[in-house]
Design a protein with these regions (language model features):
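Hydrophobic/small residue at the entry helix of a nucleotide-binding pocket
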Residues: 12
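Helix N-cap at the beta1-alpha1 junction of Rossmann-like dinucleotide-binding domains, i.e.
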Residues: 36-40, 104
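Rossmann-fold cofactor-recognition segment
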Residues: 48-60
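Conserved Rossmann-fold cofactor-binding substructure of NAD(P)-dependent oxidoreductases
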Residues: 58-70
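ADP-ribose/adenylate-binding Rossmann-like module
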Residues: 89-107
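Rossmann-fold NAD(P)-binding glycine/threonine-rich loop
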Residues: 101-123
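Oxidoreductase and adenylate-handling cofactor-binding alpha/beta cores
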Residues: 132-150
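C-terminal catalytic/substrate-binding lobe primarily of soluble NAD(P)-dependent oxidoreductases
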Residues: 145-443
Length: 443
């Protein structure tokens, strides 16, 4: 019986944990779960056979390597920066490796050793990246097999609130790592538009948004991800005139978030040490010019040209115009902002999250241009069984299960962009209700 080791048991791992806990009950595997804190899993998994909970600081190399050495296959749901170390351990001990995170240069450097040892390493098999790759490649390969040419490909994804839980003006709460949300978009975004390279620096990013619509849900803002260009080779679209990968937020979010960007409140490059009783209002005012005759609100309106009422309402709801003491007074501006947002954007136990993803293709056929819009909407159940956890964890769990059943017989370093991987995974995802709806317009 194979021993599966899961490293990391955070919010995004709940469906994956349930999946393999069920397999362990059927004596299909031994399932070890290692995390800095496993106490939250004890009430859920207590008395279930075939499951072992292991308190582990994954930064402790000796302890981590010992556990990996005694397993057969490793699934990493750790922060992405730890994957190269875990992957190195897996290569050293001859263990297969699976993750939902982006494949790094450090991971690619291990490719010769992975291949020489006959191991299977699969990365980018979650939601974004993951389901986005698989669903897009299915359409891309079908078009190529017909001799059609893909002229434009845009893909957007967002982790948001279900409509019934949108109880604040931002229509947003944290459904994944808050720090990643606060720092999102820093750097320069690159994509292709009608054969031209487009560069979007951070200070313009949240002003350069596309309108993306979903049937029954309305309109969203889509802003470009940092790197769309590298996916030309991943998708076999090296000469495509237009390619863009982006992130979705509810309409109006980006305009309001841009206020924080323009003021410098998302800067993570330096540390502040503010007086102990500094308020939200004083924190905001620190980023505004001095003017004895004007209020914080007036100075903000002067500094931000398109500071409209919906944007004002969003900042007001967060408490930035009130004398509320800051939860933390030491840290970078981004860290202090994050602490404020965590108090306002925390998911409540009754909240439901939502995943939205949309691919937009323009394909040249022998008869003209065919436009395909392929959309996915997934609503979470509750605080533990979120749409994010479902769409991140299930593709990874299914891939591991297919590998254990020898329905995946590949070796080497892979992404789920080939039919041997994406066809069976997408088919299994449909059995869990994760499926895309397509509209096709031909002209």
């Amino acid at each position: 019986m194979k021993t599966l080791l899961l490293l990391g048991a955070g919010k995004s791992a709940s469906y994956l944990i349930d999946y393999f806990a069920d397999l362990a009950q059927k004596e299909a595997c031994q399932f070890w779960i290692a995390d800095l804190s496993v106490a939250h899993l004890e009430p859920i998994l207590a008395r279930k056979k075939g499951i072992k909970l292991i308190p582990l600081d994954s930064g402790n190399m000796t302890q981590r390597r010992d556990i990996i050495q005694n397993s057969d296959l490793v699934i990493s749901m750790l922060p992405a920066f730890m994957h190269p170390e875990v992957a190195r351990d897996c290569v050293d001990f001859g263990k297969h490796f699976f993750s939902a995170s982006y494949e790094s240069d450090a991971m690619r450097a291990l490719k010769p050793e992975i291949e020489s040892k006959g191991l299977f390493f699969l990365n980018e098999c979650g939601l974004d990246p993951g389901i986005d790759h698989m669903s897009a490649m299915k359409i891309i390969l079908e078009a190529k097999q017909k001799g059609e040419e893909i002229r434009s490909f845009k893909s957007y994804c967002g982790g948001l609130l279900a409509p019934q839980s949108e109880d604040n003006p931002w229509k947003y709460k944290f459904t994944w790592n808050p720090r990643n949300v606060v720092l999102a978009g820093q750097g320069t975004s690159r994509y292709m538009d009608q054969g031209e390279l487009k560069l979007v620096p951070y200070h313009q990013l949240f002003r350069r948004v596309d309108e993306v619509s979903f049937v029954g849900l309305g309109k969203f803002d889509g802003y470009p991800n940092r790197d769309s260009l590298s996916y030309r080779s991943v998708y076999g679209l090296e000469n495509i005139p237009t390619i863009l990968r982006g992130t979705l937020r509810r309409q109006g979010f980006c305009r309001a978030w841009d206020v924080f960007v323009q003021l410098g409140m998302t800067d993570d490059s330096y540390q502040l040490s503010l007086p102990e009783h500094t308020t939200y209002r004083q924190f905001l005012n620190a980023f505004l010019p001095w003017d004895e005759a004007k209020s914080v609100e007036e100075k903000l309106a002067d500094l931000i040209p398109d500071f409209d009422f919906p944007t004002f309402e969003k900042l007001q709801w967060l408490g930035f115009f009130e004398s509320i003491p800051l939860p933390k007074t030491e840290g970078s501006p981004a860290q202090l902002l994050q602490h404020i947002l965590e108090q306002n954007w925390a998911l409540e136990s009754e909240d439901q999250d939502m995943i939205v993803m949309q691919h937009q293709f323009e394909i040249q056929t022998e008869h003209g241009i065919k436009k395909i819009t392929s959309s996915l909407v997934e609503i979470g159940k509750n605080e533990r069984h979120t749409a994010m956890a479902k769409t991140v964890g299930l593709p990874l769990a299914i891939a591991v299960d297919l590998f254990l059943q020898q329905k995946i017989n590949l070796r080497g370093l892979h992404l789920p962009v080939i039919p041997e991987l994406f066809d069976p995974i997408l088919k299994q995802l449909e059995s869990f209700g994760i499926r895309f709806t397509e509209t096709v317009i031909e002209s």
